[in-house]
């Protein structure tokens, strides 16, 4: 790894299949974070719903939900501090004032500092026969929260958001170099192809890195990956429970943008829809 000197920074995707045993999920997060750190990673991205997951949402999700600052984020903070790495993971967040629905939230955890950024999923998975919105409340449209690690600026988005290019465009416009994308990309006909195309497109059209961590099978599609600003997969995992590490750098982003200055040449900005359910 000595060839990657200067501002290069090692990041990892961690792929596993979270379940209904919250203690087991945390133990697997700790194991995979340690494995990634041993391979040189300084930031590790875990899947959506890493704190708790069942294939069919129900009242158990409300019971398993936690506030930010609760046991799950406290445990992540302890792991991050012990290993000296940043962690990004999805969790089920308890929302005040809503007795049924929870938040599908991603948190970024820094060593010694705890939560440094958070994101509530904007676009819920009401597609392909699923109705995530029955049990999950959408996040509010707000300025993207970024955090910095190793001189690299990171943003957050979640799973189904990948089908909405405006989400990633707002993140790159806020100044991010990398978008971390925890996911629970459900398997199905052509779904693996959709996952690869969309993840690659978000990296290529924004000339930024995408670090996309999915659930391992049998429910998730696997295929967690890190894609560079030219749309090249520089680290991938197939179906295994594992981690994959790659180097990211602002120099690579700048070099790609000199060749492909699409962001500078565009003629449109992203604005929020006034009536998002009008069509």
Annotate each PLM feature.
Residues 97-174, 187-197, 201, 258-262, ...:
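Active-site catalytic loop in hydrolytic enzyme cores
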């Amino acid at each position: 790894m000595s060839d990657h000197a200067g501002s290069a920074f090692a990041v990892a995707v961690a792929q596993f299949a979270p379940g209904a045993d919250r203690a087991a999920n945390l133990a697997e997060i700790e194991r995979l974070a340690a494995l990634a750190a041993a391979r040189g990673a300084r930031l590790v991205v875990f899947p959506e719903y890493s704190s708790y997951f069942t294939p069919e949402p129900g009242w158990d999700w409300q019971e398993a939900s936690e506030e930010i600052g609760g046991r799950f984020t406290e445990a992540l903070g302890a792991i991050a501090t012990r290993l000296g790495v940043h962690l990004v993971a999805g969790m089920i967040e308890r929302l005040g004032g809503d007795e049924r629905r929870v938040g599908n939230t991603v948190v970024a955890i820094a060593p010694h500092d705890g939560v440094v950024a958070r994101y509530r999923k904007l676009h819920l998975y009401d597609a392909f026969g699923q109705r995530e919105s029955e049990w999950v409340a959408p996040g509010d449209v707000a300025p993207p929260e970024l955090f910095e690690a190793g001189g690299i600026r990171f943003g957050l988005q979640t799973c189904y958001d990948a089908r909405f290019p405006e989400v990633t465009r707002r993140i790159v416009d806020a100044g991010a170099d990398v978008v971390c994308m925890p996911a629970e990309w459900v398997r199905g006909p052509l779904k693996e192809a959709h996952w690869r195309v969309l993840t690659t497109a978000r990296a290529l059209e924004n000339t930024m890195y995408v670090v996309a961590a999915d659930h391992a099978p049998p429910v998730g599609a696997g295929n967690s990956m890190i894609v560079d600003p030219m749309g090249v997969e520089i680290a991938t995992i197939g179906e295994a429970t594992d981690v994959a590490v790659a180097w990211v750098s602002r120099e690579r982003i700048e070099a790609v943008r000199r060749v492909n200055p699409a962001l500078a040449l565009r003629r449109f900005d992203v604005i929020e829809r006034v009536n998002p359910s009008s069509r």
